[in-house]
Every structure is written in C-alpha cells, then in structure tokens.
Curated annotation (Swiss-Prot):
Subcellular location per the Swiss-Prot or TrEMBL entry: Mitochondrion matrix
Biotinyl-binding domain sequence ranges: 624-699
Organism this protein belongs to: Dictyostelium discoideum (Social amoeba)
UniProt-recorded name of the protein: Methylcrotonoyl-CoA carboxylase subunit alpha, mitochondrial
Keyword line: ATP-binding, Biotin, Ligase, Mitochondrion, Nucleotide-binding, Transit peptide
Pfam families hit by this protein: Biotin_carb_C, Biotin_carb_N, Biotin_lipoyl, CPSase_L_D2
GO cellular component: mitochondrial matrix; mitochondrion
C-alpha cells in the first residue's frame, strides 16, 4: 500500500530525506551524554544512561540550581538565568558545555531544542551526536503544511484542508466553505494547542482566524495558519515509531491521548481501547510509511485523528521522544531511551516488527500544578509536602521534583507523570485510581482530585473517549467536593491531639503553647474543644480522651468525638505512624489505616476517602514545630546527613550530639533537646533532607 521506492522515483524532492539511511554505519560507542533539558525528562534519560554505564552531564538555569536533575548528574553546568530563552534555548551555550565536559552526544529530551533543526545542524557541524532525527526530517515535519504535502505524496491519509501560502481572509473563507463547517484553524508552526481554534459557523471565521494568528505570532513568531475539516467526536491516537540508519523502521503500537484540556493531553493509555487488530496494523503501517517518507532516524511519534467510523488521518509527527512514552515502554517491555542510545551509536534496532508484542495495559496520568475549577489555570508554589505511591515494576513516578521544591513560573507546571501497568484495561484503571489516592501534595493547587473523578467516570471506564471528553462531561467532572464526612472530621481532630500528645512526650517545654492548655494529661479523662476553619465555615469538635497511651497499649489512644452536628463518633486504638504523618484508628467500628494527616503552617490537611480536606488551625491549637515536624530536632535548612551518632533505643542526654548535617557548605550538629530515649531516626548517612524535616524523635 505504501511504496517508498515509488515515492523516491516519483519525486526527486524526497531523495534528500532518504539519504539519511545507509551512511556512516560504523558503531560509535557513547560513554558520556549531555541532557539539554530539565525536570522529569532529564532525570528519566539519566536513569537509563547510568544503568548502561554512560556518564551524564546536566545543564541548569539559576532557578534550577537545586533541582533533582542537577543532583542526579555526574557533572552539572550553569548556563544562564531562569528564562528559557537565556538558558535552555541557547544552543551555543549547550554546545560549549558539551565540549568542555567531553560529552560525545546530546539528548534534547522534549520541548526546548528537541525539535529545532538548526540545533541539530549545529551539533553535526561541531562533531557532536544529536540523539534525535536528522535536521532534514525535523524541518520536513516541523511545518504542518509542508508535512501534509509529504504525507499526501507518500499515500498517508490526511484531513481535507487548506495549507496554502495565501493567507488573505477572502481565500481562507473560500477554502473553509469548500471544506465545510465546522473547521479547525491551526498555526502552521504550532504545537501544544497554541494557535488553535474551532469555528462552527462562517460568521465566526474572521474572529477565529485573527485570534489564532495573534497567538501563533506570539508563540512561534509566525502568523500563518491552515484550515482543516474538524471531525466531530474524534479520537487522538498516535503511533510510536523507531528507525535506524540501516533502513529499518518499526512501530511500537499506539497510544490513545484523546482526553485533553486546552488541547493538551492529561491522561494517556496504551493500547487504545476498542481498536481492532486490523485497524492497529493499518495505522502502524501508515506511521512507518510517514517516517520513511522523511528518512527518519530515532524515536518519533506519528499522530492521527481517528473518526467514529474508524477512518484515520495524519495530523502531525513529533520528531522526539514523547512525554507519554513510558506507557509504550510498559506494554512492550522495552526501554525507549536505551533504543535511542543504540541508534545514536549507529547500531541496528534491537527488535524487528514481528518480535514486538503488546503485553497488558498501561495508563499515564499527568499531575500538574493547576486549578481545574479555574479552567485549568496553571499554578506555582512550593511543594510543602509531597508523598507518592511506592514505585515498582508496575508503577512509575516520573518526576523531577522533591518535597520543598518550587514549581516555577518559568517552566511547564507538570509535577510528575504517574504510570501504571496491569494485565488488562479494567485492572490497570483500578490500579491508577488506587495510586492517585496515595499521591499527596500540599502547598499548591493540583489536578489530582480531577484525575480521580476522570478515572471513575462511567464513560471513561467504558473506553468511550474522544478529544471533547472533558467539555462534554464538564458538569460531572467539575462536581463540587463532597462534604467532609463525620469520620474524616473525627480523624482530623484526633490526629491533631495525637500530635499534641507526641509533643508533650517529646519535650516538656515551659515556653510551649501546650503549657497553657491546662488539664490535658495522658491517662486522664478530659473534654477538649477543637476549632477548625474550613473555607468560610467554622467547625467545632469536642473531643473526650477516654484512655490508652500506656506501654501496654503501644501508644494507642481512645477518644469520643462529638461533632457540631450532634453526632458522636468513637475513635479507638488511634495511633500516629510514618514519621507522625499518618493516623490509624477504628472509627465507629471501621478501621482506617495510615490516613495521611499533615500540618503545614496553620493548616491541617487530611487525605481520606479519595478526598483532600484542608482545615485551618487556630493558633492556640496548632502544635509547636508543626509543618509536619514534631519536637525541635528539625533540619535548619536543606542538606545532607553526614554522620549519625546514636541508634534507635539509645538513652541520650540533653545537648548530646545526635547527628551531623552538611548544608550550605557548612556542617551542623543536631543535638538532643531533652534527656530521653531515641524513638526514631528517619534518615541515614548520605541521604538528602529538605528544610524543616524531622531528623529524630526523642521521648
């Protein structure tokens, strides 16, 4: 169906693309690479490189000097201020670092310079391997109009549309009328949803075109647009392709990326639901033909629009590794970054098409700092608390941030990618929901709750996805948060008082706010009133301590909690766990295990029943040393543990050195505030500690 030989003979224009294969086939071992990127993709590339014994070099802006990718690299170099145009987009600076460090190759990641043909050319001129496609292929696919012409000549299906150079409004109106409404206005040099408008009626075309042109000019410096037929109820299905310099090209099956907001992907899955083997083969063959049409080398993604009648059309080709590549890795059991390194060394592809198989199902959920209730407005701020589900062979947390890091205004607000795999779609989706329940972030708005609602939506569970999924189901997806249950409120009040008990046991401080509370003593019945502010509502909870707390009870306590609605909740065997950041208890006969409850500044946040609730704490109730810290053995600033001088269970004296910590190029001695017993030492030698984290608990 797709004949590359006929294509070359038919049009000499394409011959220059084909010459990228079968040349310079001598294998060139790569021992050091520079990653010209930041965040999670830089960390992702480094992980594979290190596993293969390849040294890594990081570049960073002033805003990223303490970033995870900098600490992961074998070497790191400052390349400029925070603004990307003065750092990560400066090709000459990156080439200079590559030369200084002795890096033989540059991996561009995605974004920034990854699809910049001039940078690929610069690497070649400087004798540095660009881990990506040839510059000719980047140029060919970088223009939406030119790439569609190439696809038409290659026999790849394309959407009816106008891709001409005449940008006059009269011509655009005429072409739109020929195509038929609704139409999609797209920036010729666009990407990431920028410069894209849907126009339903002819009378709205002029406004849509002008708006698209303004956005295209601001984003890409090019105002040209194209007009395409807008397909109703379409799906966004993309094919992962890989090619080497020996003429081999394969596809690694498809990913469904239909669920989007602001024309940007938010959740992806592989394989695509409800796709027949026949259609899968047709789309895979078309993607390979598209790659061969431009002499492609390396990892690439061919994006298609799939209509309700299973006809599909070429949309664009991303000439880089995609954000969502991990789900392809999960279902094929292949490391695509490792494939990139092999191809960059002029090796052949590790596998042939017939050897590649689909195993199970995988989802990726993108966790963003954004507010879904405000049209997904991006946010910034400090990750005051961050805890994730435990990574494994079937669960990946792809991230470039740690607790205490800032989500900056300068870069994309993506915090992480949560990737799960299981034997089939139903099990994988259940796994994703459970993992989202274990993902806890405090300090800024995120889309985690939205992702939970999305993953439990009946239409999504049935695989009935399309690019308009979120607008269509907006009302149910944007439902207001459920009221806080009696159980959750009782757990919140109980956890706050347990932190108080731990505080009293850890340190009897005459200056502590607890010394003025009066009457609250372990093993004595006491009624205490706790006040919270939840948004605009004041919540009053009366808690009666009814026993427990002795050695025989293993630190468990019993409470009777009376809520302001008059309901009485019995909380038994309540105990703090995991560095005092979770609570376990029986509440009215139901057992809650390790419910996250964290204090940051003046707010207690509790994660329970799939919800995140924030309760402001009056100052007379807040435990001293809150922000998730109990007692006074806290890190004075971010740093590294260099020595631990005691063991759990040791008896220590007030002022005795407990551990040494290196921070800001100085060594700090952390001493015991009281005479007592070492109850916990959360950190080991050489571990990195964030600001204001508990280093030890003495009781």
């Amino acid at each position: 169906m797709f004949s590359l030989g006929k294509l070359v003979k038919k049009d000499a224009f394409f011959y220059r693309y084909i010459t990228n294969v079968n040349k310079d086939l001598k294998i060139k071992p790569i021992t050091k690479i520079l990653i010209a990127n930041r965040g999670e993709i830089a960390c992702r590339v480094m992980r594979t490189a290190k596993s293969k014994g390849v040294k890594t070099v990081a570049v960073y802006s002033e805003a990223d000097k303490n970033s995870l990718h900098v600490s992961m690299a074998d070497e790191s170099y400052l390349i400029g201020p925070a603004a990307a145009k003065e750092s990560y987009l400066c090709g000459n600076k990156i080439i200079d670092v590559a030369k200084r460090s002795g890096a033989q190759a540059i991996h561009p990641g995605y974004g920034f310079l990854s699809e910049n043909s001039d940078f690929a050319d610069l690497c070649e001129r400087e004798g540095i391997i660009f881990i990506g496609p040839p510059s000719d292929a980047i140029k060919a696919m970088g223009s939406k109009s030119a790439s569609k012409d190439i696809m038409i000549k290659a026999g790849v299906p394309t959407i009816p549309g106008y891709h001409g150079e005449d940008q006059s409004m009269s011509v655009l109106k005429s072409e739109a009328a020929k195509i038929g409404y609704p139409v999609l206005i797209k920036a010729v040099m666009g990407g990431g949803g920028k410069g894209m408008r849907i126009v339903e009626r002819e009378e709205d075309l002029e406004d849509g075109v002008e708006s698209s042109k303004r956005e295209a000019t601001a984003s890409f410096g090019d105002s040209r647009v194209l007009v395409e037929k807008y397909l109703v109820h379409p799906r966004h299905v993309e094919i992962q392709v890989f090619a080497d310099r020996h003429g081999n090209c394969v596809h690694l099956f498809e990913r469904d990326c239909s669920v989007q907001r602001r024309h940007q992907k938010i959740i992806e899955e592989a394989p695509a639901p409800h796709l027949s083997e026949e259609l899968r083969k047709k789309m895979g063959d078309a993607a390979v033909a598209a790659a061969k049409a431009v002499g492609y080398v390396g990892a690439g993604t061919v994006e298609f629009i799939l209509s309700a009648d299973n006809s599909f059309f070429f949309m664009e080709m991303n000439t880089r590794l995609q954000v969502e590549h991990p789900i392809t890795e999960m279902i094929t059991k292949q490391d695509l970054v490792e494939w990139q390194l092999k191809v960059a060394e002029s090796q052949t592809l590790p596998m042939e098409q017939e050897q590649l198989k689909i195993h199970g199902h995988s989802f990726e959920a993108r966790i963003y700092a954004e507010n879904p209730d405000s049209d997904f407005l991006p946010g910034t701020g400090k990750l005051a608390h961050l805890s994730t589900p435990t990574p494994s062979d079937t669960l990946r947390v792809e991230t470039g941030v740690r607790q205490g890091d800032e989500v900056s205004v300068y870069y994309d607000p993506m915090i992480a990618k949560l990737v799960v795999w299981d034997q089939d779609r139903e099990k994988a989706l259940r796994y994703l929901r459970n993992a989202l329940d274990e993902y806890h972030i405090i300090g800024l708005n995120t889309n985690i709750s939205f992702l939970k609602r999305l993953s439990t939506h009946p239409s999504f569970m049935a695989g009935e996805v399309e690019t308009g999924f979120i607008p269509i189901h907006r009302e149910s997806l944007m439902a207001p948060q459920a009221p806080m249950s009696d159980d959750s409120l009782a757990l919140a009040a109980t956890s706050l008082l347990l932190k108080e008990i731990t505080q009293q046991k850890s340190k009897e401080d005459p200056n502590s706010p607890w010394s003025s509370l009066g009457g609250f003593r372990i093993n004595h019945n006491l009624k205490k009133q706790v006040k919270f502010n939840q948004k605009d509502n004041k919540v009053v909870v009366n808690v009666e301590f009814i026993g427990g707390g002795g050695a025989a009870a293993n630190g468990k306590h019993n409470f009777k909690v009376t809520l302001d609605n008059g309901n009485v909740v019995e909380v038994l065997d309540a105990k703090l766990n995991q560095n005092n950041e979770t609570i376990s208890a029986h509440v009215n006969g139901r057992f809650y295990n390790n419910i996250k409850s964290v204090i940051v500044k003046d707010t207690l946040t509790i994660f329970n029943e799939g919800q995140q609730y924030q309760l402001d704490i009056p100052q007379d109730v807040k435990p001293k040393g809150a922000d998730g810290v109990l007692g006074s053995l806290v890190s004075p600033m971010p740093g590294k543990i260099t020595k631990v001088m005691v063991n759990v269970g040791d008896m220590v004296k007030k002022g005795q050195p407990i551990l040494l910590m290196e921070a800001m190029k100085m060594e700090h001695t952390i001493r015991s505030p009281i005479d007592g017993k070492v109850e916990s030492l959360p950190y080991n030698v050489n571990e990195i500690v964030e600001d204001k984290k508990t280093l030890a608990v003495i009781v």
